[in-house]
Amino acid sequence: MNNATKRVVVPALEEILYEPIKVLDHGFIRVIDYMGDDSAIVQAARVSYGKGTKQLNQDKGLINYLLRHYHTTPFEMCDIKFHIKLPIFIARQWIRHRTASVNEYSARYSILGNEFYLPEPQNIAPQSSTNKQCRESDSLPKEVAEKVLNILEEDARNCYKHYTKLMNTDEEGNIIDDNNTGIARELARMNLTLNYYTEWYWKINLHNLLHFLRLRADPHAQYEIRVYAEKMLDIVKAWVPFTYEAFEEYRMCGANISRKGLEVIKKMISGEKVTHETSGMTKREWEELTKILK
């Protein structure tokens, strides 16, 4: 059989195709398929104004320009499909990005495996006192974290035990008690804790993937989703290195500055002393600007 293809092939991505990349304790990411590379972005962009240039440094410059000026369509020419195993509570956060095609493992048709996520002790922390949606950076004392882990593990194991008891089947689907009918899988699943693992296929174009990564690979993102995003960044780097470099330069390591912020910077450059009180900015805006300028 001749397996030759006329498609664009990225050797670095071919090396990891179908291979599970471990994330968290039981999770993974696998690249299942992809379409296009950096050249596909350039090709789509040049349709707008003719054949143009072909040298690699000029391709790189064009990609930098496109990303810097927020062009979107050329980056939509590349697609990638992942197979991802992740905790249910992270999947619910992830699915809020409504720009991908998703097909998830169904607990109506199948029995969920007995695998659940337990955080590392250093990742167990109290609620942030300044941010309603995240934890403090300092973890709980080791002995307290161990108690938390014991509760999480005990609850998860008990819930799975009751899950199989409600269905009257074990993890493999074998009947437990011939005298017991059990209830439907679609009902029994409601008893499982959110740290149990689910799986899905997730297909997305590069433009929307970069938006996802800008938010979820950010230091402020929840740790458990951020580690998935960081692995995906490595995949993007292997797949479209020019785009990755531009993305890192203009999005991940760049900054958006407001009109007032720009005025403050101009005053500072001219030697004028500017304080929060004289800046005309809110406290949070001022803190964000000073953080950028540090």
From Swiss-Prot:
Keywords attached to this entry: FAD, Flavoprotein, Methyltransferase, NADP, Nucleotide biosynthesis, Transferase
InterPro entries referenced in this protein's UniProt entry, alphabetically: Thymidylate_synthase_ThyX, Thymidylate_synthase_ThyX_sf
Q: What is its EC number?
A: 2.1.1.148
List, for all copies, the residue spans of the domain called ThyX: 27-250
Q: Which Pfam families match?
A: Thy1
Q: What molecular function does GO assign, one term?
A: flavin adenine dinucleotide binding
Keyword Methyltransferase annotated: yes
Ranges spanned by the short sequence motif ThyX motif, renumbered to the chain:
96-106
Q: Mind telling me which NCBIfam families this protein's record contains?
A: thyX (TIGR02170)
The record's function comment reads: Catalyzes the reductive methylation of 2'-deoxyuridine-5'-monophosphate (dUMP) to 2'-deoxythymidine-5'-monophosphate (dTMP) while utilizing 5,10-methylenetetrahydrofolate (mTHF) as the methyl donor, and NADPH and FADH(2) as the reductant.
Spell out the protein name for this chain: Flavin-dependent thymidylate synthase
The protein's organism comes out as Rickettsia bellii (strain RML369-C)
Q: Which gene encodes it?
A: thyX
